[in-house]
């Protein structure tokens, strides 16, 4: 009796479909992921149970560093930095927002200090690419002229007295604005101007009032709801320093803002919303 021969099957497998799925998944994650932005210093936020997530667009972040443990700097209590993130569309992207705020801050600095920065187009372009900055206005041109790695190293030196945006206890929003308050006023002016321009443009196209309000994302986030203002302070920073930041925000009529925290069981930053009285 003859043996039954088992037909050999090919071990080759067509992986075309699997490769297509892999490429699609990789593309999806690349497009939807939010990359962590570089910050001048590591800030360990305090813990809380809040699960409100920080927005990724139309956001102004105020970072307050920890105390200088070496006590070698006159400002050992913590230094202030600012970053701006615009909308996801090309009309009011982070690049456009940063340049607009810088130009407005330049005008306000001249108005309140009687000095001109005389920034160049190249310096505007450099500022538009910066995620976070923290120097007095007088040192801003020199900072923008630095090569990026040298700039990061310069701002990362928490013992340098030239690092950190100057802030004080000024309560008068009409005059004698400190550097921090000038930036706050600048971003408000930009949000107001952009709101007016957008309202006029949409009204001409026949948009309804509801549609217009839905498009006021920058103004709504920064001024109306305060969702777009986040204070990120180190858990070891003195309360007086953080409170001074809060006072300055309220002096400039930014009474709604968020304090970034970390969940006790997670490391992802969350926020606790605070509203000034």
Locate predicted features.
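Generic cytosolic/nucleocytoplasmic N-terminal low-complexity/intrinsically disordered segments
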Residues: 2-8, 204, 273
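Hydrophobic single transmembrane helices highlighted by the model
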Residues: 3-40
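Long, low-hydrophobicity, acidic/polar, solvent-exposed interaction domains
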Residues: 36-277
């Amino acid at each position: 009796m003859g043996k039954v021969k088992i037909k050999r099957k090919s071990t080759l497998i067509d992986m075309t479909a699997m490769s297509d799925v892999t490429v699609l998944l990789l593309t999806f994650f690349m497009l939807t992921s939010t990359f962590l932005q570089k910050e001048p210093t590591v800030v360990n936020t305090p813990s809380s149970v809040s699960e409100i997530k920080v927005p990724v667009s139309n956001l102004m972040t105020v970072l307050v560093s920890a105390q200088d443990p070496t006590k070698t700097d006159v400002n050992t209590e913590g230094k202030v930095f600012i970053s701006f993130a615009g909308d996801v569309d090309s009309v009011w992207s982070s690049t456009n927002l940063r340049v607009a705020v810088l130009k407005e801050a330049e005008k306000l600095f001249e108005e309140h200090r009687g000095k001109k920065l005389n920034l160049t187009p190249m310096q505007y372009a450099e500022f538009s690419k910066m995620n976070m900055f923290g120097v007095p206005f007088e040192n801003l041109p020199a900072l923008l002229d630095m090569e990026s790695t040298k700039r990061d190293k310069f701002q990362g030196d928490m013992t340098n007295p030239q690092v950190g945006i100057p802030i004080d206890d000024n309560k008068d929003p009409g005059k004698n604005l400190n550097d921090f308050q000038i930036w706050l006023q600048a971003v408000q002016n930009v949000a107001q101007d952009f709101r007016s321009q957008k309202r006029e443009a949409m009204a001409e196209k026949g948009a309804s009032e509801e549609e217009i309000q839905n498009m006021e994302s920058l103004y709504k986030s920064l001024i109306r709801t305060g969702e777009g203002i986040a204070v990120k302070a180190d858990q070891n920073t003195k309360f007086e320093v953080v409170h001074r930041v809060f006072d300055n925000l309220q002096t400039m009529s930014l009474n709604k803002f968020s304090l970034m925290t970390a969940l006790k069981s997670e490391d992802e930053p969350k926020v606790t919303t605070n509203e000034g009285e």
